[in-house]
């Protein structure tokens, strides 16, 4: 089994505000869960490489508006969380210097695909663009948040948000009330 790094977001309930973002190895996830307060909920994105842990005791981070490039992290890749105007978390991806520059210049979200090793504009092929309303960063500048106006859906599986299911006890999934705005074509 190949090891991969996953993104963990702690989210304060009921506001769904971001409390922290960290990266861990996938095999550390089980141990990480043991450090969380009782009664947490777990939402997982479509690719199972980002996990939201939700709990009332998590304290939200303070964010500030930014127009500066953030160049930290491995290979100068910075985690980027896309949220809508209501604060709903839509997706998590990565940005490099070029994607951040294009996002600032064009007003539309651009990211860097680690698997394809290339720059991409969200919605370039689907038309499901993300118009940037503002770019935020926590005071420690460890990641970025793009607050966006999402066209149709953020998720390639047709859901408005990539976080459309909750992991229940064990490996059971519960679909969340996230609108499915289209059915992807079978290739």
UniProtKB/Swiss-Prot annotation:
UniProt xrefs under InterPro entries: PRib_AMP_CycHydrolase_dom, PRib_AMP_CycHydrolase_sf
Enzyme class: hydrolase
Pfam families: PRA-CH
One of the GO biological process terms: L-histidine biosynthetic process
The protein's Enzyme Commission number: 3.5.4.19
Keyword Metal-binding appears in the UniProt entry: no
SUPFAM superfamilies: HisI-like
MF terms (GO), sorted A to Z: phosphoribosyl-AMP cyclohydrolase activity
Main location: cytoplasm
GO cellular component: cytoplasm
Pathway assigned to this chain's UniProt record: Amino-acid biosynthesis; L-histidine biosynthesis; L-histidine from 5-phospho-alpha-D-ribose 1-diphosphate: step 3/9
Function: Catalyzes the hydrolysis of the adenine ring of phosphoribosyl-AMP.
Quaternary assembly: Homodimer.
Name of the protein in its database record: Phosphoribosyl-AMP cyclohydrolase
